[in-house]
């Protein structure tokens, strides 16, 4: 990765959180899946997502600024990447991984980073993985979202590694076996 030289590059890092949250919010309300049906208006997206129209406008403006959706003469449309990776049920969909694991499990932990670096957090505050797996609901959420996030990299690996002669496979990950499937 290139070394940063401009103030704007530092700002991009600082404000990336807002873009991520807009992405997670759009996934949460099914905006990309709604747009997979075809171009839409803010009014039709409001009906599709259950959000007030002015909030749809704000969300779509943020997503358009990042290139995740686009405004065309036909209306609001998904970008090719959103169609491929963020539409529920799409072949390469990993929206649940982003929405659930990154958005709901990992992002809240980022609020602890100052205390973690300073060493001022208690053991209970830093025991997230142990807590997740002791709670059946959180463990299921973690496993399902991790599976969704592993399917894409597994497909990428398969494109790069010829396994046509393989007779056995040892999965040492201990998860849902997304790479094996």
Region roles according to the model:
Residues 8-21, 25-29, 33-34, 39, ...:
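Conserved Class I S-adenosyl-L-methionine-dependent methyltransferase catalytic core
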């Amino acid at each position: 990765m290139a070394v940063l030289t401009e103030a704007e590059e530092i700002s991009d890092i600082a404000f990336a959180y807002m873009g991520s949250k807009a992405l997670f919010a759009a996934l949460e309300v099914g905006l990309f899946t709604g747009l997979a049906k075809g171009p839409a208006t803010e009014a039709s997206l409001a009906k599709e997502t259950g959000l007030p129209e002015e909030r749809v406008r704000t969300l779509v403006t943020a997503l358009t600024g990042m290139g995740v959706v686009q405004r065309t003469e036909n209306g609001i449309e998904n970008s090719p990447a959103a169609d491929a990776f963020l539409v529920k049920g799409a072949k390469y969909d990993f929206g649940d991984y982003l929405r659930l694991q990154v958005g709901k499990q990992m992002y809240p932990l980022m609020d602890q980073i100052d205390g973690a670096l300073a060493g001022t957090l208690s053991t209970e505050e830093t025991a997230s993985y142990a807590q997740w797996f002791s709670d059946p609901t959180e463990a299921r959420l973690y496993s399902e979202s991790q599976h969704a996030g592993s399917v894409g990299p597994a497909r990428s690996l398969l494109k790069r590694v010829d396994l046509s002669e393989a007779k056995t496979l040892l999965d040492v990950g201990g998860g849902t076996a997304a790479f094996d499937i």
